[in-house]
Amino acid sequence: MLDLKRIRTDFDTVAAKLKKRGVSEDTLTHLKELDEKRRALLVQSEELKAERNIASAAIAQAKRQKEDATQQIADMQKVSADIKTIDNQLVAIDQQVTDIITVLPNTPHDSVPVGADEEDNVEIRRWGTPRDFDFEVKAHWDLGEDLDILDWERGAKVTGARFLFYKNLGARLERALYNFMLDEHIKEGYQEIITPYMVNHDSMFGTGQYPKFKEDTFELADTNFVLIPTAEVPLTNYYRGEILDGKELPIYFTAMSPSFRSEAGSAGRDTRGLIRLHQFHKVEMVKFAKPEESYQELEKMTANAENILQKLGLPYRVISLCTGDMGFSAAKTYDVEVWIPAQNTYREISSCSNTEDFQARRAQIRYRDEADGKVKLLHTLNGSGLAVGRTVAAILENYQNEDGSVTIPEVLRPYMGGETVISPK
């Protein structure tokens, strides 16, 4: 959430930054006008309360002296009525301010490319060379069925579209991947966490999913619970409402969890395969950092995601998302996209973001600066390390062989009991 004081004191800068994200200046102008009206009413309210206190003292004195206080009482009742009217106006204005400021996106960092959509994203670097196949490549969903390791038909029967069963070496490959990912992140100083798979609405607000993106989630009816769309939500909210010791920062968390997404607005997109599911496993990275260190930590986090792909031998590229393609809470985002041969393109497999103090303000996560003893908002970062199902898809397609088998990447073999290949039955 943006700082209302910042909007008030640096309006033109904030308006210019949010314009790059498609926010009309009229919206900010209305917010500023509401804030000015609210502050004026607060002054009026305080002045009237001072009058009421004086009148109350005069009434008390008149009564002690057995004097008639009828007029003073009438005057005080009028002042009290005026205060109540102003208080009601303040409640209404506060709600309007909240309704606006809670759905304003984060302001982009100055290094973020300006653009409308994914066409304006900027490629930063590539790693690896896509394999030159001398046979016709199969899509991962066909490979999964032919190898009897992925079962979409029964997933649809048991649950519905965009669900599946992993079987046999497919299940072991999925498990091997997330164990490998967690182990790699632990080597880099991340603390492994097992989170709840449900969170409350306050947690969803804290990380920015609520109130704007409710339609993308699965809520449990008649409860305060929501199935997590990503482990970012419980990991970031771990410290919600707390003040951390600045000497402890930065703090790194990692967790593997299922992610549940309604995929509202995705009808007709990626209807086959592992790219877009309602339920999928993902290894998440979350950091809590001092403001002056957060962009260095973003580079490290992105490198942590890249490390997984490099050790798996999967070609990828890193993209800096433009202002029109970034997520709601992000100030800057790098997408890491893995090569998918059957689609002849790169697809997102990790998204690493610095939200600066946007989530920390919503969730009230602060730290005490050891230098001056002051309590300040910290910066939060999050990233996929990686989306496990998409990594399975990338391995199946990039490591497929002409005979229909798939070679298991060398780094995963110790996690799979020494298996080296997944062969057709």
Swiss-Prot record:
Pathway membership of this protein? Aminoacyl-tRNA biosynthesis; selenocysteinyl-tRNA(Sec) biosynthesis; L-seryl-tRNA(Sec) from L-serine and tRNA(Sec): step 1/1
Q: Broadest EC class?
A: ligase
Q: Which InterPro entries match?
A: aa-tRNA-synt_IIb (IPR002314), aa-tRNA-synth_II (IPR006195), aa-tRNA-synth_II/BPL/LPL (IPR045864), Ser-tRNA-ligase_type_1 (IPR002317), Ser-tRNA-synth_1_N (IPR015866), SerRS_1_N_sf (IPR042103), SerRS_core (IPR033729), tRNA-bd_arm (IPR010978)
A single GO CC term, please?
cytoplasm
> Residues that bind L-serine, according to the entry?
230-232, 284, 384
Function of the protein: Catalyzes the attachment of serine to tRNA(Ser). Is also able to aminoacylate tRNA(Sec) with serine, to form the misacylated tRNA L-seryl-tRNA(Sec), which will be further converted into selenocysteinyl-tRNA(Sec).
Q: Which family does it belong to?
A: Belongs to the class-II aminoacyl-tRNA synthetase family. Type-1 seryl-tRNA synthetase subfamily.
Entry remark concerning the domains of this protein? Consists of two distinct domains, a catalytic core and a N-terminal extension that is involved in tRNA binding.
Q: What is this protein called?
A: Serine--tRNA ligase
